[in-house]
Amino acid sequence: MTPRAARPATLALAAALAAGCGGAATEAGAPPSPAGAPGGSALQVPSPWLVADSLDPALVPAGFGTLRQEDVNVRLQYQSLLVRLLPLDESVIRTLSPDAYRTLRELLASRREEIEALSRRYALARARLWLVSFHGIEQGETRFSPLELTVRSGGRDFRPVDAVPLTPGFGEQRLGQRETQAALFVFDGALDVNQPMAITFQTVQSTAWDAILRRVERERSLIRSRAARTPH
């Protein structure tokens, strides 16, 4: 993990995301305007790496989700740290509201070079990316090891191979009260977020993803219904 100066736009974006702001859901029963359709703005993503990820025919269409980021975040508390984790797979983030989806795609596009460099360094045929934030909730300084994270899925343990810092000072591994640090964690592509997962940070484990996955699957069904009712 090599700290580097974060771009001003990325800092503002990371701060909002780390705080759990993922866009509000639309009113019940009212499908959102899809990205690129009237009432929405087209998402411009120049990265072939991102485009390839978004062309999987098994994915639900983009721009019809209503979930908020907090609906799909896994939260863990370890001592004086609050940890939030969000898998950034297309299959997950397409269930979010159009604004939240667009924001996360733009975040990934803004860090494309670092992500691709890490994929080459670790010989990853495909990288799985998670947005992970750490928030200090007690007085005084808290030291932590951000990569002490394990995701167990399909009988295998996955640990992040590296991280792309989104906030300055992430590599210093310490937090003050109410301070937040965030990064994109890079996992091996064999990690399947569409399966149950147990997530462990240090000594604290969460299986909350099982319930989140059921919520995501329900939203996918609703998205298909909304898309089918939308005039082409």
Feature annotation, model-predicted:
Residues 11-15:
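Hydrophobic helical h-region of N-terminal Sec-dependent signal peptides
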Residues 22-232:
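Conserved functional micro-motifs across diverse proteins
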Residues 18-20:
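C-terminal motif of bacterial Sec signal peptides marking the signal peptidase cleavage site
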Residues 1-10:
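Bacterial N-terminal signal peptides that target proteins for export
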